[in-house]
Amino acid sequence: MSKLTIVRGFNDVLPLDSYKWQFLESKVKLILDRYNYSETRLPIVERSELFHRSVGESSDIVSKETYDFQDRNGDSLTLRPEGTAGCVRMVIENNLATRGQTQKLWYCGPMFRYERPQKGRYRQFYQLGVEAYGFDGIAIDLEVIAIAWSLFKELGISEYVTLELNSLGSSLNRQEYTQALLQYLKPYHAELDEDSIKRLDKNPLRILDSKIEKTQKILANAPKLMDFIDHDLRLRFKQTCQYLDALGVRYKLNENLVRGLDYYTGLVFEWTTDKLGSQSAICAGGRYDGLVENLGGQKTAAIGFAIGMERLLLLLEDLGKLPNQDNACDVFFILDSAQLHQSLAIVENIRQELPQLKIDMDLKFGSFKSQFKKADKSGAKVAIIIGQDELDNGFAGIKFLQQNEEQQQVAFNELINFLER
């Protein structure tokens, strides 16, 4: 029989690593509570049509990377490759953005893309998503960027990340620019890299995102998207930059930042780092004011971003910003296996009364000698002995495992007071 192993591109989070996730998730919740965003939990499976209509048929994600399957009813379903589309579907289906309602939401969970696995890029990966609906003005753009900035500051990595900004303008602006870009690139067709040639027909704007040096040289003299953007949208982008200056948020302009999802309009942004090699983007987002309407809802202003949690953890680890793991328990009980009906009741009562304490015991209930060895290895400060003699006398034995103090006796009805000290 063959050995069962994990699927390529997927990862187990082992007990020794789970504390890193708990640390990061606690910081995420701290920041989002500060900005009064509400958590939502979304299904990992959606109808395939949702992503075809939102992410885009011609996008790399839909054309090459989704996990699609048919259920027993013959419906085409997809493991979600990103969270925004599902969040918009939920907002529409539950009438959360009608009649001028506003929503500030966040979610965190696994996404799935069939990509070549490498450091920082996996086939199952976790994303934090932050989405806001019903806000037209610049203030929400600034708030969403400030949320990411606040999280990076809370984690102690703000000096190692860079905010990159661009504006994609309106859909009409992009159509006009796309034609100008295609006209410019026509003489260079044979010199473009293979991926860029494929994108000429499907999604020409994505050529701007090419990392191939030869293609970048060709693009150096290409028409600039900003020159095709309406005056009011250019002014809005300029004002956004001015407000970021006032907030003290560092940024740089990136005219080639276009994002790989078709639904973005207006402001787009990424937070990047030079500490993770080729997987430099740890956060990306922007406005998607047309998506709610495109998916059947009312016309609704929208903006959001996603953070790759694994990449963020890699960065925290690389910079030494993760706390040390503390698996030590506070109290270790040494029990007589012949009297468990009494001693376990005492232990459970203490767990209920003092929930902040980490309490452990040897559930194999070996000899007292072997239990004391496990108590020493547990890192506990105190061992509490409850054997036959202790039960007969009404006192628990107290041994201090990390201090040179004599063993004490404490009455069972005083144990809680003793442990609270």
Swiss-Prot record:
Keywords: Aminoacyl-tRNA synthetase, ATP-binding, Cytoplasm, Ligase, Nucleotide-binding, Protein biosynthesis. GO terms for biological process: histidyl-tRNA aminoacylation. Its EC number is 6.1.1.21. It holds the Pfam family tRNA-synt_His. InterPro entries: aa-tRNA-synth_II, aa-tRNA-synth_II/BPL/LPL, Anticodon-bd, Anticodon-bd_dom_sf, His-tRNA-ligase, HisRS-like_core, HisRS/HisZ. It catalyses: tRNA(His) + L-histidine + ATP = L-histidyl-tRNA(His) + AMP + diphosphate + H(+). Belongs to the class-II aminoacyl-tRNA synthetase family. Homodimer. HAMAP family: His_tRNA_synth (MF_00127). This is Histidine--tRNA ligase.
